[in-house]
Amino acid sequence: MPVKIPDHLPAAGILESENIFVMSETRAANQDIRPMKVLILNLMPNKIETETQLLRLLGNTPLQVDVDLLRIHDKESKHTSIDHMNTFYRDFEDVRHKNYDGLIITGAPLGQIDFEEVTYWDHIREIIDWSQQHVTSVLFLCWAAHAGLYHLYGLNRKILQQKRSGVFVHRRTCQHFPLLRGFDDEFFAPHSRFAEMDIEELKQHSELQVLAQSDEAGAYLVLSRNNRNLFVMGHPEYQKSTLNDEYHRDLAQGLNPNVPQNYYRNDDPKDDAIARWHSHGSLLVSNWLNYYVYQLTPYDLSDMSAVTPWESQ
């Protein structure tokens, strides 16, 4: 959250140059405050686990957040009861007429399937297109990040020979971005995917900017230049046991998976996993919610034309 300071205080320029969020008394006096409305499109098989992971991060901020859960279809989920889905989830037709401050689109276990071959691809495209007019900021996670970059910018991914699974060191490639406030120079984040984007293609795209990357895992944080779309190539929401659960699931299915890198103590699956990314995940979602949702969204959500770009603040 911002520090409110007197108008024209000399320290303001110094703090802003250090990427510290300060707000003048004049601007603070004109701020309206209300709960943030966030929609979550949950594409993961275990709906309840993913709900818990995302709500844990959203709940770790000073802002009040009202959450709606969205499903892609009304078919029964393999890992979640239809009663749960019917009770807590909405269909797109229920929210199509609404506007939201934020939208989170989760990953999905579809890493090796061409986007156009995904059975609900048309629904994904429709929701992404809708979000560009009805949502202040969209957070795309893992598979959804690849899908969003493909649909919005025509960028395709490369399928990997082996699943990339593990916890990798990342570094900031830009400095003075609100999203990166409080980030260490290097930080950890988990990945679990069968594909990757071409980082040079991302860097050369005029509408995108790469904010963080890994020597081992490639591009990690990519932001559209209009600040409306944030693409996160990993899984900062994962809890400590998730990569372990996925590894043993793949073993049971005879997929001969590689051991997740930098995850188990001594890289031995018989030892405990080490969670190195929770503080990063909390800070990432907090910064997104504060700087790219709360600070930019209109008080009156019926008027999305009032979304304030960063350069106007």
UniProtKB/Swiss-Prot annotation:
What GO molecular functions are on record for this protein? homoserine O-acetyltransferase activity; homoserine O-succinyltransferase activity
| Disulfide pairings | none
Which SUPFAM superfamilies does the record match to this protein?
Answer: Class I glutamine amidotransferase-like (SSF52317)
Catalytic activities: L-homoserine + succinyl-CoA = O-succinyl-L-homoserine + CoA
Localisation = Cytoplasm
Alphabetically ordered keywords of this record: Acyltransferase, Amino-acid biosynthesis, Cytoplasm, Methionine biosynthesis, Transferase
Catalytic center residues: 142 (acyl-thioester intermediate), 235 (proton acceptor), 237
Q: Name one Pfam family in it.
A: HTS
Where does this protein hold substrate? Answer: 163, 192, 249
**Assigned EC number:** 2.3.1.46
What this chain does, per the record?
A: Transfers a succinyl group from succinyl-CoA to L-homoserine, forming succinyl-L-homoserine.
The protein's name is Homoserine O-succinyltransferase
Q: Which organism is it from?
A: Shewanella sp. (strain ANA-3)
User: What is this organism's lineage?
Assistant: Bacteria, Pseudomonadati, Pseudomonadota, Gammaproteobacteria, Alteromonadales
Query: What gene is behind this protein?
Result: metAS
